[in-house]
Amino acid sequence: MSQVNVKTVKASEIELKEHVVAINRVAKVVKGGRRFSFSAIVVVGDGHGVVGHGLGKANEVTDAITKAIDDAKKNLIKVPVINGTLPHEMIGKYSGGFVFVKPAAPGTGVIAGGAMRAVFESAGIKDVLAKSKGSSNPHNVVKATIDALVKMRAPHKVAMQRGVAMSKVFNG
């Protein structure tokens, strides 16, 4: 795998919007029966290329969401967004989930499933085509989408690494 340039961001510096992706009721089987609690998956972002995801678990839904938001604020990354879309195609993988993301022409919109849509909207990506394969579990899909976004490379960084002009990066 090539070197991944991930720029982490401090949550206190920016204003973030939260998207609750999924809330699950989970059970722990004990001697007296089942003990129920909740887990929540949340995606946060500023709409300008910063996105993060988090998982929270608690006995109450609101507490689980709060914990997930706090966790998401600790996992913020910066994604290269060019004219509201991605710089290039990429495949993201996590566990059994595979995600294929592709840049789209202006006006296309976000063509993606529910869990992926939350990630793209939080990151401020307005035009993208995405397909999820394998696992449809929201947790795996969110992590695979974040993996694909982490692997994205900005065109100016590619040009700098190759030692060529920006026009050569796109036109060969």
From Swiss-Prot:
One Gene Ontology term from the biological process aspect of the record: translation
GO molecular function, one term: rRNA binding
Gene3D superfamilies the record matches: 3.30.160.20, 3.30.230.10
Cross-referenced PROSITE patterns: RIBOSOMAL_S5 (PS00585), S5_DSRBD (PS50881)
Disulfides per UniProt: none
Residue span(s) of domain S5 DRBM: 16-79
Residues that span the membrane, as ranges: none
Record flagged with keyword Ribonucleoprotein: yes
Keywords: Ribonucleoprotein, Ribosomal protein, RNA-binding, rRNA-binding
Domain of life: Bacteria
Cellular component GO terms, alphabetical: small ribosomal subunit
InterPro entries: Ribosomal_Su5_D2-typ_SF, Ribosomal_uS5, Ribosomal_uS5_bac-type, Ribosomal_uS5_C, Ribosomal_uS5_N, Ribosomal_uS5_N_CS, Ribsml_uS5_D2-typ_fold_subgr
Function, in words: With S4 and S12 plays an important role in translational accuracy.
Family per record: Belongs to the universal ribosomal protein uS5 family.
Domain notes: The N-terminal domain interacts with the head of the 30S subunit; the C-terminal domain interacts with the body and contacts protein S4. The interaction surface between S4 and S5 is involved in control of translational fidelity.
Family annotation (NCBIfam families): rpsE_bact
Subunit-structure text: Part of the 30S ribosomal subunit. Contacts proteins S4 and S8.
Stated name of the protein: Small ribosomal subunit protein uS5
Biological source species: Cytophaga hutchinsonii (strain ATCC 33406 / DSM 1761 / CIP 103989 / NBRC 15051 / NCIMB 9469 / D465)
